[in-house]
A protein has these predicted regions:
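Short, basic, alpha-helical segments at the C-terminal edge of helix-turn-helix-like DNA-binding modules
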Residues: 5, 30, 60-66
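Helix-turn-helix
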Residues: 11, 15, 19-53, 57
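Solvent-exposed, amphipathic alpha-helical segments
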Residues: 15-22, 65-76, 102, 153, ...
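Alpha-helical DNA-contacting segments of helix-turn-helix folds
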Residues: 56-62, 106, 115-118
Length: 189
């Protein structure tokens, strides 16, 4: 009996991910999700209190992948910014890209939820990360607007890879190319 319950919960989550990705939080209807999951609408409420709780479950873990990447990299005591990323952050960012649909849902489809504005929060957190790195590695001082621009561009680059995702190899190649451009620029400061 427990296997059946887990299977239904997973069907609901899979259906919700598809519907939230195709539409967004505000446009998605529980009836559409139930139809996609091939269950009655009332059954969704057995597993999830409401649509927002269901949305939370769909995007669970995405923010953590991002912050974990930054924290892993910040914990390293040596290496250039690009070396630190390769040692500490790349596996987490890879995980984000493997969950590209959830990343797009969180960033582009979350208006009306507590997750709205997630991109701005990521940009702010990455800006702090870049400022910490610049304090360690930069050869001069720079207007903080530069760090905001760099962080915004990097987050938007990740999102573009997620939005145009073809397959894992393609995503990792795009990430590698983007990082090469990014780190050559940052390491020249």
């Amino acid at each position: 009996m427990q296997v059946l319950k887990e299977e239904i919960r997973n069907r609901i989550l899979t259906a919700a991910e598809k519907i939230f990705y195709e539409q967004d939080f505000r446009s998605a209807k529980l009836t559409d999700i139930a139809e996609e999951a091939d269950i009655p609408v009332a059954l969704i409420y057995t597993y999830f209190k409401n649509k927002e709780v269901l949305f939370d479950a769909v995007v669970a873990g995405v923010n953590e992948h991002f912050t974990d990447a930054l924290e892993q990299e910040e914990a390293l005591k040596s290496g250039s910014p690009s070396q630190r990323f390769e040692k500490g952050g790349v596996e987490y960012v890879h995980g984000l890209l493997q969950n590209h649909v959830k990343l797009v849902i969180l960033m582009d489809k979350s208006a009306g939820t507590k997750h709205a504005g997630a991109k701005d929060r990521w940009v702010e957190r990455l800006q702090l990360h870049i400022e910490k790195g610049a304090a360690r590695f930069a050869h001069g001082s720079y207007d903080p607007a530069l760090f905001h621009i760099l962080s915004n561009n990097y987050v938007e680059g990740l999102l573009e890879i997620a939005r145009h995702y073809k397959n894992d190899d393609w995503a990792m190649e795009m990430l590698s190319l983007m990082n090469r451009c990014y780190y050559h620029g940052v390491e020249s400061l």
